[in-house]
């Protein structure tokens, strides 16, 4: 795949959302190659199409105090957090048209337009995103994997048992290190993507029930010493992405 990887640095969520729309249209028209946007966001909670308001635990006063924006967006899944120290990736790539069951997962969605054909193996696409992140983490020295029936990338309990931030009871459970929530638009271009926890302020997960699951969340900073630089993590992700999607 001829991939254009673009590093946007720290960028507002709404601005990045608009860029996805602009670039996806260009890709669909053949004016831009498949693109991977890599970035960080200011503090924000985003709710997908399956989002439930009760999974937001902080009130408006607390949100203002912590400087957190809230957006309801057109990806699949429930609520997640984005913020500085977390690597967000938005792959914008065309998928091969393929009729598929819309109900296969809550964490990815197709454009809701029954007048147009359902396109693409989006479940297979999400599995490839998981494979990409697992491979990138392996390059960084962290073993990770999937969990049956769930979307995202997880660290086994015996790996993060030394995590000083994690509650003792949570060290006995798998912990989520990367979240995935995507959309495939009516022209077959992917939107949204993944969020990999590198060294974010983990206190912000206290404000939500992430992805509607009461499971522990972990970051590379909990697992590696020293913490790899963000540029190193980005390169690992780009290399893994190019290999998996070759």
Tell where the protein language model's regions lie, with residue ranges.
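Residues forming well-ordered secondary-structure scaffolds
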Residues: 124, 128-132, 148, 175-177, ...
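Short conserved catalytic/interaction loops centered on acidic-Pro-aromatic/His motifs
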Residues: 142-147, 191-192, 203-208, 246
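Non-catalytic surface loops within mature trypsin-like serine protease
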Residues: 95-97, 157, 184-186, 198-200
């Amino acid at each position: 795949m001829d991939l254009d990887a673009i590093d946007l640095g720290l960028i507002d969520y709404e601005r990045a959302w608009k860029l996805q729309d602009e670039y996806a249209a260009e890709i669909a028209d053949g004016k831009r190659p498949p693109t991977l946007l890599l970035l960080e966001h200011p503090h924000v909670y985003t709710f997908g199409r399956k989002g439930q308001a009760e999974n937001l635990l902080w009130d408006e006063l607390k949100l203002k105090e912590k400087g957190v924006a809230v957006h309801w967006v057109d990806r699949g899944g429930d609520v997640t957090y984005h913020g500085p120290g977390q690597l967000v990736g938005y792959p914008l790539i065309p998928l091969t048209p393929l009729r598929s069951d819309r109900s296969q997962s809550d964490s990815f969605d197709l454009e809701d337009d029954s007048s147009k054909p359902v396109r693409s193996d989006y479940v297979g696409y999400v599995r490839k995103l998981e494979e990409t992140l697992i491979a990138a983490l392996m390059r960084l020295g962290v073993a990770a994997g999937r969990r049956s029936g769930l979307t995202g990338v997880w660290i086994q309990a015996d790996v993060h048992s030394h995590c000083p931030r994690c509650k003792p009871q949570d060290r006995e459970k798998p912990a989520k290190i990367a979240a995935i929530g995507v959309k495939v638009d009516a022209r077959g271009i992917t939107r949204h993507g993944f969020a990999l926890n590198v060294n974010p302020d983990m206190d912000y997960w206290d404000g939500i029930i992430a992805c509607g699951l009461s499971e522990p969340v972990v970051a590379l900073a909990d697992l590696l010493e020293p913490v790899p630089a963000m540029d190193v993590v980005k390169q690992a992700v780009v290399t893994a992405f190019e290999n998996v999607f070759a």
